[in-house]
Amino acid sequence: MACMLLLAACDNYLDIQPTGSVIPNSLAEYRALLARSYKDVSKFSDRGMACFRSDEMQVRDNEYDQNYYMDIERWNDLAPNAYTSSFEWAKYYNVLFIANHVIESRSDIKEGTEEEINQLVGEAYMLRAYVHFLLVNLYGQPYTKEGALDTKSVPLKLDTDLEKVLKRNTVEEVYTSIQADIDEARKLVMKAEWEQRYSYRFNAASVEAFQSRVSLYKGEWQAAWDAAEAVLAVKSVLVDLNDAAATLPNSYNSVENITPLETPLSLSLIHI
């Protein structure tokens, strides 16, 4: 009996919410949680830095740029300069954790309609697919390269288990997971368009736009075409470049944008 009382007391103690912490329960709280992940994704600039390792960009001959980017350009990963900018792969996995938490909590989300909850979870599937897509293309072989499908790329993270030891998955396994998440998102994301202040969120057109990009990277030309046509059927407006006052496509509020989520180049890279 004493043991039972002790266990009950422990359960009650563990149920206490720590002061100053927020454990999401409502739709609004889960939406705020996902909004933080959207913000993190918007700051990813690793692809911009990766351009130093191709013929797209060259580090300028000044002390500042040399300190931060020269060893990236030279592929010096073993003993880089202490000031060398780092690739932020860990932040990608932070976003994956939040996306997984929203997906796993689908049946526990309160104070929202089924449609609103489905939309939120669908966006989480899209975030998970998109982040895995970025990772596999930064750290894996191109999908269409001969023999690439069986090569190791990045670990898939599909749950919130922090104790699980992750192992690298093959390029094919990562792309299979990406496609599965897109398929789930397609069933859940029904929002046609968000008002401008929420335009960073995924909508139905962005699901098909991402599908087109994934198919393109896989060399599935017809599938890429079909998905692109589905997007153009609902979003085909172009910026009039003859208008001096036109908002260019690189702006988040351009009429061409579908989901203005990311900035592939950070401000520190723009003028290099």
For each predicted feature, which ranges?
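Short coil/turn linking the two alpha-helices of tandem helical-hairpin repeats
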Residues: 136-143, 193, 219
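Membrane-proximal, proline-rich intrinsically disordered regions
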Residues: 10-54
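Inward-facing hydrophobic residues that define packing positions of alpha-helical scaffold repeats
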Residues: 96-99, 175, 182, 228, ...
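Conserved, well-structured interaction surfaces
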Residues: 69-139, 169, 187-189
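Short coil/linker segments at helix-helix boundaries
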Residues: 138-176
